[in-house]
Amino acid sequence: LKVQGAYLAPDYVVGETEAAEWGEKIKTTTVPWIELRGKQIAFSVPVKYMKLKLQSEGQSFVTRLEQSLELWDDWVLCYNEFYGLDDAESETFPKPDFPVRVVMDAHLVTERYSYYSNTNLELLQTEELIDMIADPEQVKAGALNTSHVVGWMSLGLFVQTYWPTPAPNSFKDMYSL
């Protein structure tokens, strides 16, 4: 397989990416999207917002971004532990070996700021939600309820209960409590 005319997107990876070098790559990249990746979560975001944040906030944005991604990892680990996915019984009930995926989009099906399925979360493509992803203080405060939505996504993925299709959602929700 031969690939031509492609190059590696300047993704930000917690614990691996050097901040100053990443900032320079973002300023010059022509790719439209990148990933902001922790160990447990990955955000697919438009590069235009990263350029905007680096221009207005400089390297302090990158420092806060690193802290935020670490906090997001902690959120996901908390949900994993709540559902018994803490690697205590890695043979019988292993923790997922894939990150929670969060993708920004210009228009969501729900007409709200977020939408989730059992495997990924979609966020409305806005600067406000970039701040929610990249500001450690907002992550600590619940991240505009997005951390809660990650929990609902985990519930659908990890609850080991079968429901017949016609079962009312209100009944399923009451049982889950």
How would you label these PLM feature ranges?
Residues W22-G23, P32-L177:
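Catalytic cores of extracellular degradative/oxidative enzymes
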